[in-house]
Amino acid sequence: MEVSTSYCTPAVNFKYGSFQDSDVSMREDDLFRMGSYNSQGYYADGTHLDGSIGEEDETSSGSNDQHMDFEEDDFDMESSMTEDLVDEDEEEEDEEDNDEWTNQKRTDNQNSVAYYAAMEMLRIRFPFQSIAIRISDFCCLQEKDLLNDTMIDFYLNHIVEHVLPDSNGSNVTVLPSIFWHNLSLRQHAFDSEDEKMMSDEQKMDLKFGDLHDFVADFDLQDFDYIVVPVNEWEHWSLAVICHPFTAQARTVIFDSQLTADLNNLQNMATLIESFMKYSYEKRTGNAMPFPLPCILPQRMPQQTNNFDCGIFIAEFARRFLLSPPKDLDNFDFAREYPDFSTATKRTEMQRVVLSLSTNRARWRPLVELLNGYSTAAPHRAL
């Protein structure tokens, strides 16, 4: 595969779940109001209210309307007080029953799968991200499952903060996976009619203004490498911006499921370059001095299934950041990293999470359980 440095291809129109008024047809008389009831004392679903008037009560009520006159001497105060005390006792019993029901419901919730899935295993603060890993996130590390954004963000930051040696001399940062999601949505942030009414500066502000604020806490010029995890259509790939705003500036794209059509990857690099241009001009008031060509490494390892893309980009990032090629324009992956393997990557990532957890012994049975399911059927993409 030849190194691709040309990316002047027309942009591809991506559609991320458009919504139209015609997609929903709802009549007012179809609306169901939970807990509403009518004048006959029935809920909307036909359930009779406990405190509603029954047939016998309605009869007696009607007769009482005709005999409202009574003698004051006939009023039995003792009987009335006794009835009031009985009513109070019944109310207290109802409250106790409600408390028991509430406690039982709370216990049931704590025993539910959702309760355990939301339990937090690790909370860690990286320089620009605070990440909480829950059991549901950790379960993505079992075989035949796709990694979710939490595990991708965690491991990429772990590489930068805990794996790269201080003597490396490179300044590296990781943008969270939500960055690419927001960036990709901005590429068609306005329709053709709006575009005609806007200046070039207004168009760029509309597309990238919010994202520029997103990275306002640090200067992109301070970094030698900017790592950008990319998720498109439930597939992970990786973009690494190398030496931005210098003559050596390149965007290296890593993908473990290449197709004959590389336009999508080239468009990815083009969108990243557009944002970098915008960010540089906003910070300095000048045009970006150097272009940001796209590099696609030759002989890149490819996955043989539909669920290991996240595992591959995790190892791509580790290998590349530990030992970046000196000549990016002739980047041959197989030559640079001949012993590349992802065979034990999932268990390695499990060990990393446990090593940083303050209660690691508590989670070891979970690890054994997950690894015991290594032959299970593939799970739905997260």
Swiss-Prot record:
Biased composition (Acidic residues): 84-100
Coiled-coil stretches: none
UniProt entry tagged with the keyword Repressor: no
Annotated metabolic or biological route of this protein: Protein modification; protein sumoylation
Localization per Swiss-Prot or TrEMBL: Cytoplasm, Cytoskeleton, Microtubule organizing center, Centrosome; Nucleus; Cytoplasm; Mitochondrion matrix
Induction statement: Up-regulated in response to mitochondrial stress induced by antimycin A.
Record's keyword annotation contains Magnesium: no
Membrane spanning stretches: none
Gene Ontology BP terms: determination of adult lifespan; innate immune response; mitochondrial unfolded protein response; positive regulation of protein import into nucleus; protein desumoylation; protein sumoylation; proteolysis
Tissue specificity comment: Expressed in hermaphrodite-specific neurons, head muscles, body wall muscles and pharyngeal cells.
EC numbers on record: 3.4.22.-
Phenotype upon gene inactivation: Animals are viable, but sterile and display phenotypes including an increased lifespan, age-dependent decline in their pharyngeal pumping rate and locomotion, reduced body fat and decreased oxygen consumption and an impaired ability to maintain mitochondrial membrane potential.
Organism superkingdom: Eukaryota
Gene3D superfamilies from the UniProt entry: 1.10.418.20, Ubiquitin-related
Keyword terms of this UniProt record: Cytoplasm, Cytoskeleton, Hydrolase, Mitochondrion, Nucleus, Protease, Thiol protease, Ubl conjugation pathway
PROSITE patterns xref list: ULP_PROTEASE
MF annotations from Gene Ontology: deSUMOylase activity; RNA polymerase II-specific DNA-binding transcription factor binding; SUMO-specific endopeptidase activity; transcription coregulator activity
Listed GO CC annotations: centrosome; cytoplasm; mitochondrial matrix; nucleus
Location of region: Disordered: 46-106
Family: Belongs to the peptidase C48 family.
Function: Protease required for deconjugation of smo-1 conjugates from target proteins which is necessary for cell cycle progression. Required for respiration and the maintenance of normal mitochondrial homeostasis. In response to mitochondrial stress, required for the removal of smo-1 conjugates from the transcription factor dve-1, which promotes the translocation of dve-1 from the cytosol to the nucleus to initiate the mitochondrial unfolded protein response.
Record's protein name: Ubiquitin-like protease 4
Species assigned in the record: Caenorhabditis elegans
Gene designation: ulp-4
